[in-house]
From Swiss-Prot:
Gene: NAD4
Keyword Transport found: yes
Primary site of residence: mitochondrion
Keyword field contains Chaperone: no
Protein name: NADH-ubiquinone oxidoreductase chain 4
Pfam family, one: Proton_antipo_M
GO molecular function terms noted in the UniProt entry: NADH dehydrogenase (ubiquinone) activity; ubiquinone binding
Length: 464
């Protein structure tokens, strides 16, 4: 194994001589992947970094999407600053998933906004200033409440280490206050109604790589924050507020799905579908069931494959050729871009949660856990499957069926680079849908420990 690591790093080092900026980023990613099974202590400052099965899937997802996001913009943007911003964002996200301290998590949670803000501000679309302001105001302001909660832990126990905080028993009233403070940051980051309006704006104005990493990884910080900051530390408050969170998630799923049906901007459609899927992830992780926890993690991974791929199609392949994102400009792709049409069909059915895709497994387990926790709200949320089928089939039927519109001149089908991106994201979606044991085995230890903690610490288990 050591020899394999040495060969990997040697190969990356040779590559870095050819492309210094990209090579540096690859060395950072490879170095972090090498130390996945290890723990790194910085005892002098009370910080250490490690990973478990839960963190591993987010770390590997980030490392997988990072080079793909660079390749996606290869023909459009060649600025070294652009690629360095992407690499910096990726490394910040990797460290965020590995840190074992609340304060460190918050710091990297906020620092991740900096490269994304600059990416959108410098390389975004026409309304990029508005989008950059949205992401700064919404996410930064809401996270101040999270900082207040973390500061409370520091004052009370003199430590913000995950394990140390989980051992402290706080009063129910204080737990409720801390729960609301931490949830304020998570709710915006997910995002849930009514603080969701920033995400479609940011996606519509963001460069392609920014949209890929935002949908694929950054939104997952909300699920990860619940696992690390809320469930192990605020058990009483979680039991009390889970019904409220379930109501908000159900409203988010139904509302955003209906809004998606009325959208005409293809990028906004994909953005709203991301909101709905992330709400399902929140339902699963708070279901107090092993099925729901596993389903939430699997769906997070599945969404990390499918959503960036859809953004590549609507914000990359089609937009690069025709410079339009409105659905009315496109029709009949099956006749003049058949390869792209096939990719779109596969990804649309994956986004719906069709059997034999990893999305199906994630949604099935998440909704099973949600229905077990709250039958009524879980069943209402299950309508997300029908609504997502409605808007995705609407998009697919419009784009692939019929004859070519006058707005779209005949052009070449997907290039080798574009097909490489599509195949790289479609293969894991289908592979893990057919053979999900690889994911389940990876997350099993972490999710099982989380479930054991839930059933031993939480006083209320079952239907709400």
């Amino acid at each position: 194994m050591t020899l394999i690591y040495i060969l990997i790093l040697a190969g990356v080092s040779i590559f870095s001589r050819l492309l210094p900026t990209y090579g540096k980023g690859l060395i950072l990613v490879a170095s972090i992947l090498v130390v996945l099974p290890t723990m790194t202590d910085w005892e002098e400052v009370g910080i250490y970094y490690t990973s478990d099965g839960i963190a591993d899937i987010f770390i590997l997802l980030t490392a997988y999407l990072l080079p793909l996001s660079i390749i996606a913009n290869w023909n459009n943007i060649r600025s070294l600053l652009y690629f360095e911003l992407i690499l910096n964002l990726g490394v910040i996200l990797l460290i965020n998933f590995m840190c074992q301290d609340m304060l460190s998590f918050y710091v990297y949670f906020e620092i991740s906004l900096a490269p994304l803000f600059i990416l959108i501000g410098l390389y975004g679309a026409n309304n990029r200033d508005k989008a950059a302001d949205y992401i700064l105001i919404y996410t930064l302001f809401s996270s101040l409440f999270m900082l207040l909660a973390i500061g409370t832990y520091e004052v009370l126990i003199g430590n913000t280490d995950y394990q140390a905080v989980s051992l402290v028993v706080l009063s129910t009233d204080l737990q409720c206050i801390l729960f609301l403070c931490i949830s304020a940051g998570i709710m915006v980051k997910t995002p849930l109604v009514p603080v969701h309006t920033w995400l479609p704006v940011v996606h519509s104005e963001s460069p392609l790589a920014g949209s890929m990493l935002l949908a694929g990884v950054i939104l997952k910080l909300a699920v990860y924050a619940i696992i690390r900051l809320i469930i192990p530390t605020l058990s009483d408050a979680t039991v009390l507020y889970t019904p409220v969170v379930y109501v908000i998630c159900a409203i988010t799923i139904i509302y955003t799905s209906i809004i998606t049906l009325r959208q005409t901007d293809l990028k906004v459609i994909v953005a709203y579908s991301s909101i709905s899927h992330m709400a399902v992830c929140i339902l699963g992780i708070l279901s107090n069931s092993l099925a729901g926890i596993n389903g939430s993690l699997i769906l997070s991974l599945a969404h990390g494959f499918v959503s960036p791929a859809l953004f590549i199609i609507v914000g990359g392949i089609l937009y690069d050729r025709y410079h339009h994102r409105l659905i009315y400009y496109y029709q009949g792709l099956l006749t003049y871009m058949p390869i792209l049409a096939i990719y779109l069909l596969i990804l649309s059915f994956s986004n719906i949660g069709t059997p034999l895709t990893v999305n199906f497994i994630g949604e099935l387990l998440s909704l099973t856990g949600a229905i077990g926790r709250s039958t009524i709200l879980g069943c209402i949320s299950a309508f997300s499957v029908l609504l997502s089928a409605a808007y995705m089939l609407k998009v697919t039927n419009r784009l692939t069926g019929g004859i070519r519109t006058p707005y779209t001149a005949l052009t070449s089908d997907c290039t080798y680079r574009e097909s490489l991106l599509m195949i790289a994201l479609i293969i894991p979606t289908l592979w893990y849908g057919l053979y999900p044991n690889g994911i389940i085995n990876m997350i099993w230890q972490g999710s099982k420990l989380l479930y054991i903690f839930v059933i031993t610490q939480y006083n209320v288990i079952g239907n709400i």
